[in-house]
């Protein structure tokens, strides 16, 4: 079965317009809508990139059927994996089960803003693997403690 999606162009449109656009996409019959999770737009001329998680939360409340998803959220540098799990779990409740979390290792354009440098590719992949392990454990329920190579989590629960 073919599913047709709509991209919320966060680098080209403000947050209020993005929510109006996803409502229109739902009315037009699109099956899902995705958004990038960028701090900066790809090009300086594009203005600013709204915070994807606030836009998704507003879209979840403004729609009833359309699925919502992040293209790639990087749970390793700009966000801690436990915080990503909390954001995703909250959005899943707001969207009444319509949210899907897309994860990846990110890119320097958006992840450098919190400092700490830009790790080598093999390190970013290690970090992503560990982050996915933490997020999965939190989604599974119960208390989670994790003391790994890149991340620590102490008695966290969703």
Regions inferred by a protein language model and the residue ranges of each:
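Internal, glycine-rich beta/alpha segment that forms the wall or movable "lid"
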Residues: 82-158
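Amphipathic repeat-derived elements
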Residues: 3, 60-64, 68-72, 93-102, ...
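Charge-dense, low-complexity intrinsically disordered segments
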Residues: 12, 46, 78, 118-122
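Short, solvent-exposed loop/turn segments at secondary-structure boundaries
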Residues: 44-48, 80-82, 115
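Active-site-proximal loop/turn and secondary-structure-junction residues that shape catalytic pockets
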Residues: 10-12, 39-40, 74-76, 105-109, ...
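Glycine-rich anion/phosphate-binding loops
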Residues: 14-18, 76-90
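N-terminal beta1-alpha1-beta2 module of alpha/beta enzyme domains
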Residues: 1-63, 67-71
């Amino acid at each position: 079965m073919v599913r047709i999606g709509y991209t919320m162009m966060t680098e080209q449109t403000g947050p209020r317009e993005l929510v109006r656009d996803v409502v229109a996409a739902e009315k037009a019959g699109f099956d899902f809508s995705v958004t990038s999770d960028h701090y900066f737009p790809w090009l300086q001329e594009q203005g600013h990139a709204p915070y994807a998680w606030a836009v998704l939360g507003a879209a979840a409340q403004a729609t009833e059927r359309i699925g919502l998803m992040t293209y790639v959220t990087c749970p390793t540098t700009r966000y801690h994996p436990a915080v990503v799990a909390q954001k995703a779990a909250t959005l899943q409740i707001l969207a009444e089960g319509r949210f899907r979390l897309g994860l990846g290792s990110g890119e320097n354009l958006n992840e450098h803003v919190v400092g700490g440098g830009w790790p080598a590719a093999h390190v970013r992949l290690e970090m992503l693997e560990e982050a996915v392990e933490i997020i999965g454990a939190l989604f599974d329920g119960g208390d989670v403690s994790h003391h790994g190579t890149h991340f620590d989590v102490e008695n966290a629960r969703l």
